[in-house]
Amino acid sequence: MTGFDSIQVRFKNTTHRQSPFANTRVVPFVQSYLNILKSVIDDVKTEYFWFFANFMSLEEIDLDYIPEQHEKDQIHVWYNTNLKGGTNREGNVFLIPTAKFKEQMDNLKFLRDFKDINYHSHNNLFQN
């Protein structure tokens, strides 16, 4: 696995899955992913960091993923396309470039307003 920092967002009243990362900070869901990111970004010390909901299974994601040179400034989002697993086009698993997020965060109204987002569809990314 990469040595990237990770942030797990804890939702109430849902199945909780343990983070596969040793260096995970768990934070409660408050208002929006963007607000959470703004509140924790100064604690992130790695070039990229994983950001994901506690109800997501990360078993099918390549946790060693490192963006290609032409994708290095993008937020990478994995989302499920299997109806049995629940769908959310905006996703609940992210790999975020720390410096680029810091550059843009004050001008974002919504996380989806980030300049460059790379959506990775996945047919077996279960959530509950």
What do the PLM-derived regions correspond to, one by one?
Residues 1-45:
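N-terminal anchoring/stem segment of glycosyltransferases
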Residues 9, 25, 50, 76-77:
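Hydrophobic/aromatic beta-strand patches that form the interior of the parallel beta-sheet core
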Residues 13-17, 55-59, 82-85, 100-103:
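Short acidic, S/G/P-rich loop/turn micro-motifs used as interaction or catalytic elements
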Residues 36-37, 44, 53, 90-92:
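Residue-level signal for functionally critical sites in structured catalytic/ligand-binding pockets
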Residues 37, 62-63:
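Conserved strand-to-helix beginnings and helix N-cap segments that scaffold or border functional pockets
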Residues 40, 47-60:
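Short beta-strand-to-loop acidic/aromatic patch adjacent to the donor-nucleotide binding site
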Residues 46-47, 73:
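Short glycine-/polar-rich loops that comprise or flank the Walker A/P-loop
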Residues 65-128:
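Catalytic-site signature of metal-activated, phosphate-bearing donor transferases
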